[in-house]
Design a protein with these regions (language model features):
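Peripheral, non-catalytic segments flanking oxidoreductase cores
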Residues: 1-169
């Protein structure tokens, strides 16, 4: 690391012997690290952005058909949908689309927590689901690589550590 004020950079294509000391120092002293050499391609990021821009540029009436519901807390979030808990506060001014890790409706965790269940995928743009799932897979590959490195730093059994991350939200 060149300075205590800079965020260290690791390249996941480097050897573990090269990465581990930099990663450990970054996470213990700064709490952040920049990562390159990961599995999320620039093309995939660009495609994901294009798909999202195409979705959010659709007319409001079309997006509202995908709106989240009390029964399925996934889908389109219109401007002002959420408000702070304080009375009279300004409603949040963002729109979004809530997706989570895909969980089968009959998975027992769905009865315990409303945040688990199947996603509601919009019909347009047609490739949004495929692109999103490819993006998630690339992010998952990167996170698994980082978690393995962190397990080595912590000197814990890698598979046992990774098992703690099997049920993402």
């Amino acid at each position: 690391m060149t300075s205590s004020r800079s965020i260290p950079l690791i390249n996941l294509k480097d050897s573990d012997d090269t990465i581990l000391p930099v990663l450990e120092q970054a996470l213990t002293e700064i709490g952040f690290v920049m990562v390159e050499g990961h599995s999320v391609s620039e093309h995939l990021v660009r495609t994901m952005r294009q798909q999202l821009e195409a979705y959010f540029s659709r007319p409001l009436s079309e997006k509202l058909t995908d709106c989240i519901t009390p029964d399925n807390y996934r889908g389109y979030i219109p401007l002002g949908f959420f408000s702070p808990n304080s009375h009279g506060a300004t409603r949040d001014q963002y729109e979004g689309y809530k997706l989570h890790n895909e969980t089968a409706p009959d998975d027992p965790i769905c009865s315990v927590c409303d945040l688990y269940g199947p996603n509601r995928w919009p019909s347009m743009p047609a490739q949004l689901q495929e692109t999103t799932q490819a993006y998630w897979k690339a992010c998952e590959t990167t996170s698994q690589h980082l978690l393995r490195l962190i397990a080595k730093i912590m000197n814990v059994e890698i598979d046992g550590f990774l098992n703690l991350f099997e049920q993402p939200l």
